[in-house]
Amino acid sequence: DRDVTGVQTCALPISLIHAIMGLNRLSGGTVTWDGEIVSNLPPNQLCQRGMALVPESRRLFTGMTVRENLELGAMHPAAKKRRAESLERVCELFPAVRQKLSQASGTLSGGQQQMVAIGRALMALPRVLLLDEPSLGLAPAIVSDMFRVIQTIHQEGTAVMLVEQNVSRALAISSRTYVLENGRVIAEGDSDELANRPEIRKAYLGL
């Protein structure tokens, strides 16, 4: 489905998203993508099938330039062919990135680094984008900009899975939400409906 799916996590968010992306082996269950069981496939094969991950804390190569970090996202053959086009699209989504292409990524602010991390994932031409805590450690104004871009990415046809502890933000932009606690799904459903459940409002929204 071409949806934004929000996952509000109280524990084990990294294990969840890493298992989906093939970075951790599953101890049970399966991951199905496009009707195919892809459990425990290596990340490079999942990337070629249309998945891309924006990891928590960005994980940029800080000694490399912004351009070099972005181009690392376009490693599989289909993405390499469209590398210049994809780079231009990233710069359209994040105008500040265009001005920093020749700068070492380690000199950027946290918000700018997050832009580069999202841009790097988009360079892989994903059909589904997995984001792990994209708002972590960012100023409120930057968070607002980041979520607007995530909405734009979705509107252009990319499905999004968002692991996020900022519950109000996640509910606002997602169509479906899963609430995890200690590795178990304790609530799921339409995001608008979940946002109006008294127990969710009390436990996660402070209302």
Label each residue range with its predicted role.
Residues 1-10:
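Single conserved hydrophobic/aromatic residue that forms the stacking wall/gate
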Residues 11-207:
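Glycine-rich phosphate-binding loops of nucleotide-dependent enzymes
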